[in-house]
Regions:
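Rossmann-like dinucleotide-binding domain for NAD(H)/NADP(H)
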Residues: 45, 51-140
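A generic structural signal for short
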Residues: 27, 50-51
Length: 140
Protein backbone atom coordinates (compact mmCIF):
# COMPACT_ATOMS: atom_id res chain seq x y z
CA UNK A 1 0.00 0.00 0.00
CA UNK A 2 1.36 3.38 -1.00
CA UNK A 3 1.29 5.02 2.43
CA UNK A 4 3.27 2.22 4.04
CA UNK A 5 0.33 0.54 5.74
CA UNK A 6 -0.09 -3.21 5.75
CA UNK A 7 -3.28 -5.22 5.44
CA UNK A 8 -3.58 -7.60 8.37
CA UNK A 9 -6.11 -9.92 9.94
CA UNK A 10 -7.34 -9.12 13.44
CA UNK A 11 -5.23 -11.72 15.25
CA UNK A 12 -1.98 -10.62 13.60
CA UNK A 13 -2.87 -6.99 14.26
CA UNK A 14 -3.52 -7.68 17.94
CA UNK A 15 -0.16 -9.45 18.28
CA UNK A 16 1.92 -6.79 16.54
CA UNK A 17 0.34 -3.35 16.92
CA UNK A 18 1.47 -0.81 19.50
CA UNK A 19 -1.82 1.09 19.39
CA UNK A 20 -5.13 -0.47 18.39
CA UNK A 21 -8.04 1.84 17.69
CA UNK A 22 -11.39 0.09 17.27
CA UNK A 23 -13.96 1.60 14.87
CA UNK A 24 -16.78 -0.83 14.09
CA UNK A 25 -20.56 -0.74 14.49
CA UNK A 26 -22.17 -2.80 17.23
CA UNK A 27 -23.74 -5.92 15.74
CA UNK A 28 -24.13 -9.60 16.56
CA UNK A 29 -20.71 -10.15 14.99
CA UNK A 30 -18.94 -7.41 16.95
CA UNK A 31 -20.29 -7.89 20.49
CA UNK A 32 -17.21 -8.66 22.63
CA UNK A 33 -15.01 -8.44 19.52
CA UNK A 34 -12.22 -7.57 21.95
CA UNK A 35 -12.43 -9.82 25.01
CA UNK A 36 -10.18 -12.08 27.10
CA UNK A 37 -8.58 -13.98 24.21
CA UNK A 38 -7.98 -10.90 22.07
CA UNK A 39 -6.56 -8.87 24.96
CA UNK A 40 -4.29 -11.81 25.76
CA UNK A 41 -2.85 -11.64 22.24
CA UNK A 42 -1.83 -8.00 22.62
CA UNK A 43 1.65 -6.87 23.52
CA UNK A 44 2.10 -5.74 27.12
CA UNK A 45 3.13 -2.35 25.73
CA UNK A 46 -0.02 -1.98 23.60
CA UNK A 47 -2.70 0.66 24.06
CA UNK A 48 -6.34 -0.03 23.16
CA UNK A 49 -8.67 2.76 22.04
CA UNK A 50 -12.38 2.02 21.72
CA UNK A 51 -13.98 4.69 19.56
CA UNK A 52 -16.60 2.26 18.30
CA UNK A 53 -19.61 1.37 20.42
CA UNK A 54 -20.14 0.07 23.92
CA UNK A 55 -20.25 -3.71 23.89
CA UNK A 56 -17.54 -4.10 21.24
CA UNK A 57 -14.87 -4.29 23.95
CA UNK A 58 -15.69 -6.46 26.95
CA UNK A 59 -15.25 -4.04 29.85
CA UNK A 60 -14.60 -6.69 32.50
CA UNK A 61 -11.91 -8.31 30.36
CA UNK A 62 -10.36 -4.91 29.64
CA UNK A 63 -10.31 -3.98 33.33
CA UNK A 64 -8.61 -7.29 34.16
CA UNK A 65 -6.03 -6.83 31.39
CA UNK A 66 -5.24 -3.36 32.71
CA UNK A 67 -5.06 -4.45 36.36
CA UNK A 68 -2.68 -7.32 35.50
CA UNK A 69 -0.55 -5.15 33.18
CA UNK A 70 -1.38 -7.40 30.23
CA UNK A 71 -1.67 -4.19 28.19
CA UNK A 72 -0.20 -0.75 28.81
CA UNK A 73 -3.31 1.39 28.70
CA UNK A 74 -6.71 2.14 27.22
CA UNK A 75 -9.05 4.93 26.24
CA UNK A 76 -12.77 4.88 25.54
CA UNK A 77 -15.69 7.23 25.19
CA UNK A 78 -18.27 4.45 24.94
CA UNK A 79 -19.61 2.01 27.49
CA UNK A 80 -21.85 -1.06 27.35
CA UNK A 81 -24.39 0.92 29.36
CA UNK A 82 -24.52 4.68 28.90
CA UNK A 83 -24.17 6.51 31.06
CA UNK A 84 -22.03 3.93 32.84
CA UNK A 85 -23.23 2.72 36.22
CA UNK A 86 -21.12 2.90 39.37
CA UNK A 87 -20.39 -0.83 39.17
CA UNK A 88 -18.78 -0.57 35.72
CA UNK A 89 -15.39 -2.31 36.05
CA UNK A 90 -13.62 0.54 34.26
CA UNK A 91 -14.84 2.95 36.94
CA UNK A 92 -13.55 0.70 39.72
CA UNK A 93 -9.91 0.26 38.77
CA UNK A 94 -7.17 0.52 41.36
CA UNK A 95 -5.66 3.98 41.71
CA UNK A 96 -2.46 2.97 39.91
CA UNK A 97 -4.31 1.29 37.05
CA UNK A 98 -6.72 4.21 36.65
CA UNK A 99 -3.74 6.40 35.74
CA UNK A 100 -3.33 4.32 32.54
CA UNK A 101 -6.90 4.86 31.36
CA UNK A 102 -8.76 7.74 29.70
CA UNK A 103 -12.54 7.59 30.05
CA UNK A 104 -14.58 10.36 28.49
CA UNK A 105 -18.29 10.84 27.83
CA UNK A 106 -19.61 9.98 24.38
CA UNK A 107 -20.73 13.47 23.37
CA UNK A 108 -19.43 13.93 19.84
CA UNK A 109 -22.96 14.36 18.51
CA UNK A 110 -24.10 16.97 20.99
CA UNK A 111 -22.78 20.07 19.28
CA UNK A 112 -25.02 22.69 17.70
CA UNK A 113 -23.47 21.92 14.31
CA UNK A 114 -24.09 18.17 14.67
CA UNK A 115 -27.76 18.71 15.51
CA UNK A 116 -28.17 21.23 12.69
CA UNK A 117 -26.64 18.78 10.20
CA UNK A 118 -28.83 15.96 11.52
CA UNK A 119 -32.04 17.93 11.08
CA UNK A 120 -31.07 19.24 7.63
CA UNK A 121 -30.11 15.76 6.35
CA UNK A 122 -33.23 14.22 7.90
CA UNK A 123 -35.48 16.79 6.25
CA UNK A 124 -33.71 16.32 2.90
CA UNK A 125 -34.24 12.56 3.18
CA UNK A 126 -37.94 13.01 3.95
CA UNK A 127 -38.31 15.26 0.91
CA UNK A 128 -36.32 12.81 -1.25
CA UNK A 129 -38.51 9.91 -0.15
CA UNK A 130 -41.76 11.67 -1.08
CA UNK A 131 -40.28 12.89 -4.38
CA UNK A 132 -39.13 9.35 -5.28
CA UNK A 133 -35.46 10.29 -5.07
CA UNK A 134 -32.63 8.42 -3.36
CA UNK A 135 -32.70 8.38 0.44
CA UNK A 136 -29.11 8.82 1.64
CA UNK A 137 -27.76 6.41 4.30
CA UNK A 138 -30.94 4.36 4.20
CA UNK A 139 -30.94 1.38 6.56
CA UNK A 140 -33.46 -1.38 5.89
Amino acid sequence: IAVGANISDLHNLLQTADIISVHVPLSKETVDLISVNELGMMKSSAILINAARGGVVNESALAEALETNSIRGAATDVFSQEPPTQNNPLLNLSEITAQKVFLTPHIAGITTQAWTDLFIKSWENIQNYFEGKEVVNRKL
